[in-house]
Curated annotation (Swiss-Prot):
This is 116 kDa U5 small nuclear ribonucleoprotein component. The modification Phosphothreonine is found at residue 86. It holds the Pfam family GTP_EFTU_D2. There is a cross-link at residue 64 (Glycyl lysine isopeptide (Lys-Gly) (interchain with G-Cter in SUMO2)). GO terms for molecular function: GTP binding; GTPase activity; RNA binding; U5 snRNA binding. The gene is EFTUD2. GO terms for cellular component: Cajal body; catalytic step 2 spliceosome; cytosol; intracellular membrane-bounded organelle; membrane; nuclear speck; nucleoplasm; nucleus. It comes from Homo sapiens. Residues 1-54 are annotated as: Disordered. Its main location: nucleus. Component of the U5 snRNP and the U4/U6-U5 tri-snRNP complex, a building block of the spliceosome. The U4/U6-U5 tri-snRNP complex is composed of the U4, U6 and U5 snRNAs and at least PRPF3, PRPF4, PRPF6, PRPF8, PRPF31, SNRNP200, TXNL4A, SNRNP40, DDX23, CD2BP2, PPIH, SNU13, EFTUD2, SART1 and USP39. Component of the pre-catalytic, catalytic and post-catalytic spliceosome complexes. Component of the minor spliceosome, which splices U12-type introns. Within this complex, interacts with CRIPT. Interacts with ERBB4 and PRPF8. Interacts with PIH1D1.
Length: 972
């Protein structure tokens, strides 16, 4: 290398190079190469790249260092290249596979003390089946009792020492909240005292009054109920409601007085006082049954065997008969059935004569129940709780109970549970009670069909169901929908009333709106798999005969609430089972919308699913477009919203403040006859409105009186009970807005003034207009209630063309509205009945909290044998939001309240008084409330702020009003 040509930094400093010649030379070489390439292309196109590597200059960005995605993965794989990372940091690049699971389920079938084949065989013998609903007040021990039955039949399932098993609380939300939300079916085989096995289909129901719709669904498919009552608390709010509901459903009633350990360990009552407490509970229940039932033979008594005593916590359950049998097994040579008849009431044992007498032999003598049942029970509990080390082993040996040293070292509760379990054995007393006093499906079928089936009981189908015939035509009544573990699909749960349902069988599903005249609400489906449900696991079966409960796959799509499943062909006369009639009303209303409007379809799908899942839930769309959910209370709607957000739609949902539904009513008779003409001016209807007699609306809603009765029977009812004249009573056209609606339409026209034949021809149209009008009142589009509408005159066109439904129906609706507005309209609001349990020193605080919310106390009284008081009160539903939290704050958590819808009451003030000014963010005085409620409800629904009179009054009617100088508060 010549150093003179470069400087110290290596830069070239020599003479200029002859670059032009070099470029010409390079160009000639390139041209020659191109010609050679062309020749090679002609000879062999494929070998071009290999033989002659290109000498062209390739830019850095055009160089290919790696194979393309298409070369690596193939042309079938789509590859997406993004220039910018738009994924938020909170979202993983590769999302984990999420498995949605909302229920606690067993992974495999657990071991049972009986073979599954034996259970399946018992299903074919309907006389050995009992369909039972366990119901009772909140926390009175229903679920814990079922846990005892599960432990008895499933040797590997045991409750942990520190917490209850709660086997039927299968939802995670139920476990977290510590309260039952859904009714859960359990099917187990249980032996009676003689060792005979029976198949028990048991429905464990929630105790909270908000979820009484779940109880209704369970009662519909049961033949009897076992009513659970806490021995310390006695008959509570929901206990009374459930007694009434069971009697209305015509079910056999038995009672289990649970938690008797509380009398001993918590209240520390002497044995005699404990007996008085138990007898008081039995007497109270009998008093309620006699109040609601017409059957004088329906009496509950331990002597009859339809009352049992239990403590689920310590595995105690006995009837007088089963306790007497313990004596017979221990001492022998005792007729335990005769002995049991002498263990209740004012009967004493004389040890000298060894006979039972009705008179106490000495002043210190105890009643037989105290001496032979309570005192031994007290001694066992006292020994275990008090003196474990010294005298307990000897006492247990005398009772024939042998425990190991490890078992004797257990803590008090598990030790007490173990001792009682060994002493009392299995729950045979409970089985005896159910077998003797709750009918089998075969015996209970006829009254069940008469009460629930809308078709004829005398038809072939009715007789097959009454006989519980497994070979008859298929009839299955589903009352509940249970979602799958992931919340995607639903399975229908119901009872087979006749025939046998098979897996894979085509069936016809009849909805609640199906009639023989209108068959639109029906669909042919194919049954998927069939299961027998045992809470946390399901036993798959191929067929289920009449008398049994069944969980059905594949028929959920057309079912909304309840359904009737029958055969697709050859069963055309089949009618439906009537929809569930709930003992409460959904009056709390919330509006919902998705945070992201594009997710509205997901929310609508979620709303459809929660509507299936909750029996009494109502979802609807207002005219303003908002989606509204109606429920029975705050806890109920909280559970609904949890399921809607987490289970069924998985989206963020906004919820409006809760409000209540209102009703519209009148307090006077219409001030003048109101009339309306049809648009073609060929027909004219005249009506007036007046209030219904007190109690009549409730009778119609409770089906004490039915519009389907013949005119003579209907007339006699109104004449005798409500003092109507016979002509008016026999002229009732309809109830509204439906067959059990609290309004009446009466034809009060005279044959001398009106052509009855012509009027009869438009009767259906007038009734439709009346029902439409009473469904959406003029004040704020709410239900009209407690109003009697009288047709006073009618001019009807001779030609059928001029008196069609399109003319008559809207006119009838308009005249209903005008008559209503002329009769001093008022708003009605729902009132809750509240029951509060609190210590005596908290009673005054309860009064204070209620008074601040327009509530008032009706009764406060001590609970017998307990340090607590029961306060009964009424509170407006609209002022009840947050009441429970407020109450607990004021009583340091010592007061516990439950509230349930009770009645409708008129809101103070005139809703149409325009002189009232509603001031924002200020509580209104009582006389202004009706106006405030009406205006705010109308705004929420997207209606104009005031009632517009021109919509409801014809021009001739307005002229008539002007003539009579009627002052109206309404804007024109």
């Amino acid at each position: 290398m010549d150093t003179d040509l470069y400087d110290e930094f290596g830069n070239y400093i020599g003479p200029e190079l002859d670059s032009d010649e070099d470029d010409d030379e390079l160009g000639r070489e390139t041209k020659d190469l191109d010609e050679m390439d062309d020749d090679d292309d002609d000879d062999d196109v494929g070998d071009h790249d290999d033989d002659h590597p290109g000498m062209e200059v390739v830019l850095h960005e055009d160089k290919k260092y790696y194979p393309t995605a298409e070369e690596v993965y193939g042309p079938e794989v789509e590859t997406i290249v993004q220039e910018e990372d738009t994924q938020p940091l909170t979202e993983p690049i590769i999302k984990p596979v999420k498995t949605k699971k909302f229920t606690l389920m067993e992974q495999t079938l657990p071991v049972t003390v009986y073979e599954m084949d034996f259970l399946a065989d018992l299903m074919d013998n309907s006389e050995l089946i009992r369909n039972v609903t366990l119901c009772g007040h909140l926390h009175h021990g229903k679920t814990c009792f079922v846990d005892c039955l599960i432990e008895q039949t499933h040797p590997e399932i045991r409750k942990r020492y520190d917490q209850d098993l709660c086997y039927t609380d299968i939802l995670f939300t139920e476990q977290e909240r510590g309260v039952g939300i859904k009714s859960t079916p359990v099917t187990v085989v249980l032996p009676d005292t003689k060792g005979k096995s029976y198949l028990f289909n048991i429905m464990d129901t929630p105790g909270h009054v908000n979820f009484s719709d779940e109880v209704t669904a369970g009662l519909r498919i049961s033949d009897g109920v076992v009513l659970f009552i806490d021995a310390a608390e006695g008959v509570m709010l929901n206990t009374e409601r459930l007694i009434k509901h069971a009697v209305q459903e015509r079910l056999a009633v038995t009672v289990c007085i649970n938690k008797i350990d509380r009398l001993i360990l918590e209240l520390k009552l002497p044995p005699t006082d404990a007996y008085y407490k138990l007898r008081h509970i039995v007497d109270e229940v009998n008093g309620l049954i006699s109040m609601y039932s017409t059957d004088e033979n329906l009496i509950l008594s331990p002597l009859l065997g339809n009352v049992c005593f239990s403590s689920s916590q310590y595995s105690i359950c006995f009837t007088l008969g089963s306790f007497a049998k313990i004596y017979a097994d221990t001492f022998g040579d005792i007729n335990y059935q005769e002995f049991a008849k002498r263990l209740w009431g004012d009967i004493y044992f004389n040890p000298k004569t060894r006979k039972f007498t009705k008179k106490a032999p000495t002043s210190s003598s105890q009643r037989s129940f105290v001496e032979f049942i309570l005192e031994p029970l007290y001694k066992i509990l006292a020994q275990v709780v008090g003196d474990v080390d010294t005298s307990l082993p000897r006492t247990l040996d005398e009772l024939g109970i042998h425990l190991t040293k490890e078992e004797l070292k257990l803590n008090i509760r598990p030790l007490l549970r173990l001792v009682c379990k060994k002493f009392f054995g299995e729950f045979t007393g409970f089985v005896d009670m159910c077998v003797q006093h709750i009918p089998s499906p075969k015996v209970g079928a006829k009254p069940k069909i008469e009460h629930t089936y809308t078709g004829g009981v005398d038809s072939d189908l009715g007789e097959a169901m009454s006989d519980c015939d497994p070979d008859g035509p298929l009839m299955c009544h589903t009352t509940k929908m249970y979602s799958t573990d992931d919340g995607v699909q639903f399975h229908a749960f119901g009872r087979v009333l006749s025939g046998t349902i098979h897996a894979g069988q085509p069936v016809k599903v009849l909805g609640e709106n199906y009639t023989l005249e209108d068959e639109e609400d029906s669909q042919i489906c194919t049954v998927g798999r069939l299961w027998i449900s045992v809470a946390r696991y399901h036993i798959e079966v191929n067929r289920v005969p009449a008398g049994n409960w069944v969980l059905i796959e594949g028929v959920d799509q057309p079912i909304v609430k309840t359904a009737t499943i029958t055969e697709p062909r050859g069963n055309e006369e089949a009618q439906i089972f009537r929809p569930l009639k709930f003992n409460t009303t959904s009056v709390i209303k919330i509006a919902v919308e998705p945070v992201n409007p594009s997710e509205l379809p997901k929310m609508l799908d979620g709303l459809r699913k929660v509507n299936k899942s909750y029996p009494s839930l109502t979802t609807k769309v207002e005219e303003s477009g908002e989606h509204v959910i109606l429920g029975t209370g705050e806890l109920y709607l909280d559970c609904v919203m949890h399921d809607l957000r987490k289970m069924y739609s998985e989206i963020d949902i906004k919820v409006a403040d809760p409000v209540v539904t209102f009703c519209e009513t009148v307090v006077e008779t219409s001030s003048l006859k109101c009339f309306a003409e049809t648009p073609n001016k060929k027909n004219k209807i005249t009506m007036i409105a007046e209030p219904l007699e007190k109690g009549l609306a409730e009778d119609i809603e409770n089906e004490v009186v039915q519009i389907t009765w013949n005119r003579k029977k209907l007339g006699e009812f109104f004449q005798t009970k409500y003092d109507w004249d016979l002509l008016a009573a026999r002229s009732i056209w309809a109830f509204g807005p439906d067959a059990t609606g609290p309004n009446i339409l009466v034809d009060d026209t005279l044959p001398s003034e009106v052509d009855k034949a012509l009027l009869g021809s438009v009767k259906d149209s007038i009734v439709q207009g009346f029902q439409w009008g009473t469904r959406e009142g003029p004040l704020c589009d709410e239900l009209i209630r407690n109003v009697k509408f009288k047709i006073l005159d009618a001019v009807v066109a001779q030609e059928p063309l001029h008196r069609g439904g399109g003319q008559i129906i809207p006119t009838a609706r308009r005249v209903v509205y005008s008559a209503f507005l002329m009769a001093t309209p008022r708003l009605m609001e729902p009132y809750y009945f509240v029951e509060v349990q609190a210590p005596a020193d908290c009673v005054s605080a309860v009064y204070t909290v209620l008074a601040r919310r327009r509530g008032h106390v009706t009764q406060d009284a001590p609970i017998p044998g307990s340090p607590l008081y029961t306060i009964k009160a009424f509170i407006p539903a609209i002022d009840s939001f947050g009441f429970e939290t407020d109450l607990r704050t004021h009583t340091q958590g010592q007061a516990f309240s439950l509230s349930v819808f009770h009645h409708w009451q008129i809101v103070p003030g005139d809703p149409l008084d325009k002189s009232i000014v509603i001031r924002p963010l200020e509580p209104q005085p009582a006389p202004h409330l009706a106006r405030e409620f009406m205006i705010k409800t109308r705004r929420r629904k997207g209606l104009s702020e005031d009632v517009s009179i021109s919509k409801f009054f014809d021009d001739p009617m307005l002229l008539e009003l002007a003539k009579q100088d009627v002052v109206l508060n309404y804007p024109m």
